[in-house]
């Protein structure tokens, strides 16, 4: 049996891709569900990428860069504290990778703490077209999603409760600080200066999400306005 396995995978340096390699109890539905919630940070980053590709919004790059810096900061803290995880996942777990195998603070929880805080502040300060209740609903949805991710890390025994609480708290702190720094950069006019660079203009990048965020209804109405205007212009040319 062992010789067969060695023949299939003879390379001793092959290890699991830890970002998507999640162990769960196959007889426990909640454990199965928690495995999917543990993938949420990857899905969020995929959303940022697709958001930028489709809309060319600079905000997608700004928040993704902040999340990346937050992730690096998490690695630094882990290698300083060096607190082990509550359960060992084997010698190959995050061994010889750029990520730390330590448990304090939880990277997933810190990611969601940053995501929740930064985007909640954005909702309350920039989304002028929403009333207070609507803002609370959006922020509450982010809070619920963050809770599910944090819970999954404890339930799957990747972290203990303290590691998750500290991780989320550190993420919330860095998210708030990053939001403040981005605000200062905007006030200084550096965002507009960046968007006016020739190489940036080639990508048609904008900052409309910050200046004038639109609702789905406004986007829909603007779409039909363009369609009707185009039809009118075509008709005028034929006449």
Curated annotation (Swiss-Prot):
| Intervals, Lumenal compartment | 1-34, 153-164
Q: Which GO terms describe its biological process?
A: lipid biosynthetic process; protein N-linked glycosylation
Q: Which Gene3D superfamilies match?
A: Phosphatidic acid phosphatase type 2/haloperoxidase
Gene deletion effect: Causes an elevation in dolichyl diphosphate levels.
- Across the pH scale, how does activity change? Optimum pH is 6-7.
Stretches that traverse the bilayer: 35-55, 132-152, 165-185
Catalytic reaction annotation: a di-trans,poly-cis-dolichyl diphosphate + H2O = a di-trans,poly-cis-dolichyl phosphate + phosphate + H(+)
According to the lineage, what is the superkingdom? Eukaryota
Keywords of the record: Endoplasmic reticulum, Hydrolase, Membrane, Transmembrane, Transmembrane helix
Which residues face the membrane's Cytoplasmic side?
A: 56-131, 186-239
- One annotated Gene Ontology cellular component of this protein: endoplasmic reticulum membrane
* Principal location listed in the UniProt entry: endoplasmic reticulum
Q: Which SUPFAM superfamilies match?
A: Acid phosphatase/Vanadium-dependent haloperoxidase (SSF48317)
Q: Could you tell me where this protein is found in the cell? A: Endoplasmic reticulum membrane
State which Enzyme Commission number(s) the record gives: 3.6.1.43
In the record, the note on similarity to other proteins reads: Belongs to the dolichyldiphosphatase family.
Check the record and name the PANTHER family matching this protein.
Answer: DOLICHYLDIPHOSPHATASE, SPHINGOSINE-1-PHOSPHATE PHOSPHOHYDROLASE
Function field:
Non-essential protein which is required for efficient N-glycosylation. Necessary for maintaining optimal levels of dolichol-linked oligosaccharides. Hydrolyzes dolichyl pyrophosphate at a very high rate and dolichyl monophosphate at a much lower rate. Does not act on phosphatidate.
Q: Give the protein's recorded name.
A: Dolichyldiphosphatase
The organism is: Saccharomyces cerevisiae (strain ATCC 204508 / S288c)
């Amino acid at each position: 049996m062992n010789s067969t396995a060695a023949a299939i995978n003879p390379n001793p340096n092959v290890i699991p891709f830890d970002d998507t390699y999640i162990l769960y109890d196959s007889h426990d539905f909640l454990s199965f569900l928690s495995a999917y919630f543990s993938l949420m940070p990857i899905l969020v980053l995929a959303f940022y990428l697709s958001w930028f590709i489709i809309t060319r919004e600079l905000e997608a790059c700004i928040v993704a860069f902040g999340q990346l810096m937050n992730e690096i900061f998490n690695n630094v803290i882990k290698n300083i504290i060096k607190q082990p995880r509550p359960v060992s996942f084997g010698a190959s777990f995050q061994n010889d990778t750029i990520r730390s195998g330590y448990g304090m603070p939880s990277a997933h929880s810190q990611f969601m703490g940053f995501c929740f805080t930064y985007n909640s502040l954005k909702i309350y300060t920039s989304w002028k077209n929403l009333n207070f209740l609507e803002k609370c609903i959006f922020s509450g949805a982010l809070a619920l999603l963050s809770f599910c991710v944090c819970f999954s890390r404890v339930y799957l025994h990747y972290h203990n409760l303290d590691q998750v609480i500290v991780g989320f708290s550190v993420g919330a702190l860095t998210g708030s600080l990053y939001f403040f720094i981005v605000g200062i950069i905007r006030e200084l006019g550096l965002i507009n200066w960046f968007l006016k660079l020739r190489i940036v203009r080639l990508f048609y990048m904008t900052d409309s999400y910050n200046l004038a965020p639109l609702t789905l209804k406004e986007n829909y109405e603007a779409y039909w306005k363009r369609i009707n205007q185009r039809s009118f212009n075509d008709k005028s040319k034929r006449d």
